[in-house]
Amino acid sequence: MDEFQRNSNXHRXWQQLFLYPLFFREDLYAIAHDHHLDRSGSSEPTEIFFSHFFSFLTVKRSIRRIRKQNKSISLFGNSDSNKLIEYNKNFSFKSMLEGFTIVLEVSIAMTSKHFIKGMDGWNSLRSIHCIFPFMEDKLPHSNYISDIRVPYSIHPEILVRIFRRWIRDVPSLHLLRLILHEWKNSFSQENLEKVLITQRGNTRFSLFLWNSYVYECESFLIPLIKRFFNPQSLLYGSFPDRTHFEKKIKDIVIFPLQKISPKXIWLLKDSFIHYVRYGERSLIALKGTHLQVKKCRYHLFHFWQYYFHLWFQPYRICSLELSKTSFSFLGFFLNVKMRPLVVRAKMLDDLFITDLITNELNPIAPIRSILFSLAKEKFCDISGWPISKLSWTSLSDDDILDRFDRIWINLFHYYSGSINQDGLYHIKYILLLSCAKTLACKHKSTIRVVREQLGSELFTNSFSKEREFISSSFSKTRSQRERIWNSEISQRNPLXXFWQKMENKQIEN
């Protein structure tokens, strides 16, 4: 790859005009085959056996089909009943997509610096918990929030139009169009979301398509919203018609008109906007009027309708007032509530006591939803009573203890910043008893016998890690009200992801 990039930099003008011959180089598909084999072998060991049947002869035949560009013939379809041959062709299709993606990634990275570094003022964070300190700082100063679910059902021709900004090679665009149609037709409408969004269905090609699509959305959408909510400030004296201006400003200014200084008036100076996205979920927090929020929702609908030719379902945009309702994001319930503060100021011999009211973001762990997820995984019943995990009784004692330990550690670290820590320790009690019942069921004994044999070894690792995590995060001088966010968490907790899917289904219905 390094040699390929060096050659591309030396012949950059040639690279922009002639990408098409690079798609037929077998060494790129060899790199893609090794990369795909490493990924599949680590997650699904059963595929290692089938991967030995990979043959570059199948890749050459597929390349010949692409060169013919006959749309009536499926490029990567197969009609063989043999499972080994069927898997071989499917594996060849994935390897070809990997090689195709390598060429596109390198070429687009060279032609667009913003594609790698991002736009000015944007931060791309690897940890999920880095989002919450930002939200704690910004959301209390906002009064509305728009929860947006980015639509994923996009037509292949729209993707081709997106890539036309970076690819100038016409044959490459035709080849890309052919592969995109073939790739989308291989999935049903229900499975397309899993392929693009979920981590299990992600391939290098699907990730590349999703990132390109989201980048295109944000590069056009966010500047438009910023321009809409942050127009140029205008002085009062610049308006020749004072009466006409006062009639207009009643619908724009948030504070009463009587308190405005007659010398200078700033138009929409207090409005600001903040944008956060993780996966397909986007949040737009703003400070403005209800009319502005409705206009923003209107422009979002028309943006996807006219620019991407998508019918944007109404449930995909939910506008909420932060002071009245709560919303869910990344497995948390989030709301903004007022927090009273008493400030004492002493000046000479006088003591002044002032009451201040500030807004505070409260992240809440969905304990009931976590209990429902644990009940579905057979750790407890619907009422929350712990039961034995029968499917794990064939494992060794160390494996059983390690699995329960990892479940609790992941939950504790993920929801360490929530305000309802008592509910988390209730979850811990359920997992502890479920672990003891699983061991008792395996050895055909009682919970008392298991606890006498193991003693303090039940969840020993989790207790030690928990104390270490708390002691390293808190000092004696810090307030106990201060929350802990773990910067090492890079993905959602599985239980939180399951709960978020249930929430999305309820919204759609």
Swiss-Prot record:
GO biological process: mRNA processing; RNA splicing; tRNA processing
InterPro entries from the UniProt entry: Domain_X, Maturase_MatK, Maturase_MatK_N
Entry keyword tRNA processing: yes
Keyword tRNA processing: yes
Annotated compartments: Plastid, Chloroplast
GO molecular function, one term: RNA binding
Recorded GO CC terms: chloroplast
A Pfam cross-reference name: MatK_N
Entry keyword set: Chloroplast, mRNA processing, Plastid, RNA-binding, tRNA processing
Stated role: Usually encoded in the trnK tRNA gene intron. Probably assists in splicing its own and other chloroplast group II introns.
HAMAP family named in the record: MatK
Protein family according to the UniProt entry: Belongs to the intron maturase 2 family. MatK subfamily.
This protein's name: Maturase K
Species of the source: Thuja occidentalis
